[in-house]
Amino acid sequence: GIYVEKDYQMAYEYYLLACQKQNREGFYHLGRWFFYGIGQKEDKHKAMQYYQQASHYHYSKASFMLGYMYHYGDGISKDLEKAKEYYQLALQEGYLEARKELDKLEVEK
């Protein structure tokens, strides 16, 4: 933390509270934690579930990460069509980095 000692358990509990209130940032950050193994054991399946919830609430970074997971088969089966859908959604939601990944997909086809 900033100005305080890091307490992953307390942060995790706050993110869970945020999720209970359908807070898209809470869903995204827990997805990130499970994707990268921050404060929790890495679990791509759980990461995907949290990213899906955040994406449902139009959180562009979560939509991008779902596209990434499908694009590269990171923790799930590779599916270029689903990757494209999520990258397009992220781009529509304002996440400009998705354009680069969409361009890569076009080259791969």
Label for each model-derived stretch:
Residues 1-2, 20-24, 36-38, 43, ...:
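Short helix-capping/linker turns of helical repeat alpha-solenoids
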Residues 79-96:
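TPR/TPR-like (Sel1-like) alpha-helical repeat modules
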